[in-house]
């Protein structure tokens, strides 16, 4: 599975490496039961799912995560740090849900309205 880097184009900062969860099982498992979240995860949400269809849960998570909700225009529409066992629905519908190690949003200076892009990394 190819890794990509999440870049905040607005601020010129990196949010780190991610993998895309493209299968049902990879989306279902997500980052559950992992202590090491050096590589984040991107969930691609089907078009037309709406705000509640973009929501996530933190069931069976062992560590907090930073989560970015990004629309089809690659703009951040919401961001949050979630603790294990929380449920969250974004303020606006998202096309991509990006799960990252806690602190990545703060360290990159990422804010709602910023533009994000994915760049290919070497495996």
Curated annotation (Swiss-Prot):
**Name of one Pfam family that matches:** DUF192
Disulphide-bridged cysteine pairs: none
Q: Which InterPro entries does this chain map to?
A: DUF192, Saro_0823-like_sf, UPF0127
Q: State the source organism's domain of life.
A: Archaea
Q: Which family does it belong to?
A: Belongs to the UPF0127 family.
PANTHER family from the UniProt entry: UPF0127 PROTEIN MJ1496
The name this protein goes by in its record = UPF0127 protein MTH_1377
Query: What organism is listed for this UniProt entry?
Result: Methanothermobacter thermautotrophicus (strain ATCC 29096 / DSM 1053 / JCM 10044 / NBRC 100330 / Delta H)
Query: Upper taxonomic classification of the species?
Result: Archaea, Methanobacteriati, Methanobacteriota, Methanomada group, Methanobacteria
